[in-house]
């Protein structure tokens, strides 16, 4: 009984800083290994003779794995506990990402990318499941904001520092650059055992599959899919939309502000975490504003277009954090990982499928705006779900 009590005792306030650092670093590696691929893609493609489809798969395949790997993550949490699952997942991610640096052909590159994506996918439900073990109830919202800040900073850092900073340091070698991003994750995985929370994870042998009878599994997942569809979709079709306006010269500015908006969203949530997280009214407002910005991108051009997609990105970032914070706040004890895994399974399946369906329609019609219309249509269908969310804690 004493061991079980120790396993649930949160760290004293003096130790919250190292816990926060570990959460931030783990969050960073939710996105860095995925988003270093786009800036390195031309170098990888030239050396390995990748087709355009395979070059795109360097980024899209790991995103698809975010949905596929949610269930293995939930299973691991139920058998190993959240901390050991997170450490294992980070090791899988680091080894898979490092294997990409050693790939000799397209096949080995795709296998390594899928393996890396599996590790990232297993990390996702492990982080929210770990929060109640490390933090007191009134710190759960802040803990979520911290690791989500790390994740969104990872998007900005991975895309922004790879070419101007790391490539010159490693003699323009994409292989060495990938290793430099990947291997430090093994140190973070080992450091997860430093917080003195007992020597073992408390594990349960209950059902690890999503509880489809719990309406929050689908409701949160489908709204999460709306946020992901908007962010990944607008990002994917940004160049096509600007080219259709004959303003492709604005693409660097558009991408900068689009990605910077996600960082700004994470900083806002660090400040507002306790006041906003778990509040249905905030979620409803963010979902509406996200769709408003998306709709504006269809109607406006030039810098007004950039303002609209930047608004959509900023609000999508807020909505992402608000939704991912819900399982630790509302799930029963021991059910956090299960609910999170179901949300990620649904959310990332939608986030992958809806923009792809929009792209197929845009290819058929020759109008890039039709891709955005598909995302907007899905968002309007998902919006009423925010009105029926039951966010009462179930402990």
Residue ranges of each PLM-predicted region?
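C-terminal transmembrane helical hairpin of 12-TM major facilitator-type secondary transporters
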Residues: 279-323
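Cytoplasmic membrane-interface "Motif A"-like loop-to-helix N-cap segments
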Residues: 79-89, 274-287
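Cytoplasmic helix-loop-helix junction between adjacent transmembrane helices
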Residues: 112-149
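A late C-terminal transmembrane helix in Major Facilitator Superfamily
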Residues: 330-367, 375
């Amino acid at each position: 009984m004493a061991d079980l009590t120790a396993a649930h005792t949160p760290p004293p306030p003096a130790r919250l800083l190292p816990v926060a650092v570990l959460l931030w670093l783990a969050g960073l590696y939710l996105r860095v290994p995925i988003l270093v691929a786009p800036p390195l893609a031309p170098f990888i493609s030239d050396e390995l003779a990748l087709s355009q489809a395979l070059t795109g798969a360097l980024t899209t395949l790991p995103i698809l794995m975010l949905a596929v790997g949610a269930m293995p993550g939930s299973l691991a949490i139920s058998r190993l506990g959240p901390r050991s699952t997170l450490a294992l997942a980070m090791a899988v991610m680091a080894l898979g990402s490092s294997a990409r640096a050693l790939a000799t052909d397209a096949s080995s590159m795709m296998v390594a990318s899928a393996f890396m994506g599996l590790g990232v996918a297993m990390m996702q439900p492990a982080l929210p499941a770990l929060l109640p073990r490390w933090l007191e109830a009134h710190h759960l919202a802040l803990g979520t904001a911290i690791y989500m800040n790390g994740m969104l900073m990872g998007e900005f850092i991975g895309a922004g520092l790879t070419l101007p900073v790391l490539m010159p340091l490693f003699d323009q070698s994409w292989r060495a650059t990938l290793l430099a991003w990947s291997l430090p994750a093994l140190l973070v995985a080992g450091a997860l055992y430093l917080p003195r929370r007992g020597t073992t994870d408390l594990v349960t042998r209950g059902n690890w599959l999503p509880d489809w009878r719990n309406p929050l599994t689908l409701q949160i997942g489908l709204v999460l899919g709306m946020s992901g569809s908007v962010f990944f979709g607008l990002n994917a079709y940004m160049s096509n939309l600007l080219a259709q306006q004959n303003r492709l010269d604005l693409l660097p500015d558009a991408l900068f502000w689009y990605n910077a908006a996600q960082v700004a969203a994470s900083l806002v949530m660090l400040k507002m975490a306790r006041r906003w997280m778990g509040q249905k009214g905030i979620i409803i407002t963010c979902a509406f504003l996200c769709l408003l910005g998306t709709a504006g991108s269809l109607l406006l051009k030039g810098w007004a277009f950039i303002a609209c997609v930047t608004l959509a990105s900023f609000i999508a970032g807020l909505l992402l954090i608000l939704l991912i914070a819900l399982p630790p706040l509302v799930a029963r004890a021991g059910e956090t990982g299960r609910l999170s895994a179901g949300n990620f399974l649904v959310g990332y399946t939608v986030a992958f499928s809806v923009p792809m369906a929009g792209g197929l329609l845009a290819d058929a019609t020759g109008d890039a705006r039709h891709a955005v219309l598909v995302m907007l249509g899905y968002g309007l269908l998902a919006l009423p779900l925010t009105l029926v969310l039951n966010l009462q804690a179930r402990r």
